[in-house]
């Protein structure tokens, strides 16, 4: 059971009003990522929120939840029980790398779902913002190059 974080039915942000299902998705993501930090030491929840704000409305639920299945104990069944649609769960499955799956296979699989492609592109773009890292390491730059190749592929350009 996912612990609820109380929110009003609607939250007013600079992007307008957010329906309750997105409100619930934000609460679940905040709970799932509580205490996690990113590579820059910032609260991890800021990443899915940035991704959510960079996609069209129809992709926002999946965008804010995009790392929940991989990075928490929350399952697809839990999200289904919370009332999220099978369509949203299909997007979440497509943007979640499976155990033993190569990165290339994951990106190819993700590319087959139009909303997953949008969410993953936004995720990768946010992950490629090296300005958030004070002193990027060689590993950070290698990850950046890998993500840029995935962006090229997901945009429909040639696979590098």
Question: What are these model-derived regions, one by one?
Answer:
Residues 2-160:
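Active-site helical microenvironments for divalent-metal-assisted chemistry
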